[in-house]
Amino acid sequence: MHPGEMQAMKEAALGRTRRIERRVRLALIVAGGGLLAFNLARIIRSPIGDFHNHWQLGYNLLRGASLYPSVAECPSHYSNPYPPFWAMAHAPLTLFSAHVAQIIVFLPMYIGSLSLLMWTLFHLTRGHLPLDGQRQFWAFTIAMLVALQFLSRDMAECGVNIGLVALAWFAVYTWTRHRDWLGGASLGLAIALKMTAGLFVPYFLWKRQWKIASAAILFALIFTIAPVVVRGPTRFATDLSEWFDVLRAGNTGNPSIGVLGPEPIGNFALRPALARLITNGPVATSEPVTTNLLSLPPKVASAVIYFIKLSLLLAFACMIGRSVGDRRTLAVVYECAGVSLLMLLLSPITWGHHCVGTLPALYLICATAFYYGGLPRWMLIPAGYVLLTLIFNRAIVGRHLSFVMTGYSIVTWEILALLVLTLGCRSLAVRRQAPVPTPSR
């Protein structure tokens, strides 16, 4: 065959591939828009998720009612573990009914939060993992497809959990630009809304970044006490006391019992996941019975779980080291993705919609694989497990089997696998970007 004909055939095949890819990209964008439209239609039809409970907290704040009502005063499935500022953040929404407020907030909150997070991740990595537009699209798309079950669950909450992740990561971005006070304000706001974001403070302290750590603590305190303006000193003191009582309720000495009572299988935090494996604890009769490997007494199991969690933290701290050097290094971004994953593992409560916190790690792993043309072979094992968990989605295997697999905490082990992958990518990037020593003469 003539060389010119071969070249023409290659160009034609390449053109067909590009057209197919453009159609696939368009189909995915349309599908994403369709998912948003579907959930908006659900919300218009009737309120969904816990949004109405959060709206009620804002309403209670303004009318002087308790933010932490007893079981007799609130739905048995909902207990408020959030700081008082969470109610204050929802207070402006009480200008409308809970249903109308959810309709109004859904699209701006969800799209705005996701856009801010994607913008932040792009600007944190573009100098180290420069991808063309095509690969950049697929890095974000694959990350969102893997996290789709979590992203779709957060739609019922109007994207508030994506917003919390975006606030914490915007703080990281501003810190890398030496704007510590702005970063501290953003992180402090996230902490005042939900305490688990506070894990970034020990990270910055470990890295000797005193300014942003101090700023985050200061702003977290300012936002936390802000409701005193509405509630008054006496009522606010009662709010704090009741909140502490809710938090203390989870310290039963039995790892199978948390803030909400017997831990449901939908709590993907590390403590209840380990408890289901090593001790016999109370469970709801409607939930599947999982295999206990050790059947340890509750006190012994608590000590074992505490040791495992502490070991995980210490291992992470030792692997990342205390040195920062240049704040804009890619290693810092991987480390913060690891902190986001640890927040999910170490939190007392981690529901499916909280797991949108895996998105930064997923994006970094995808971007790293695209930039370096793949990942080391050993990383295929944890990556394979992460992809395998997608099969156990309710839409694929059915409600019953998905329910049974959830009882074995497959999502918890997925988060751990992502932590291993994130640290592996960090090691790969540090090794690839290290300067080559000049041979001595």
Write out the residue ranges for each language-model feature:
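Active-site catalytic microenvironments for nucleophilic, acid-base chemistry
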Residues: 95, 123, 204, 363-364, ...
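Alpha-helical transmembrane segments and their membrane-interface exit regions
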Residues: 168-172, 196, 223-224, 362-368
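Central hydrophobic cores of alpha-helical transmembrane segments
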Residues: 188, 215-221, 335-341, 377-388
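Hydrophobic/aromatic-rich transmembrane helices and adjacent perimembrane loops
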Residues: 351-367
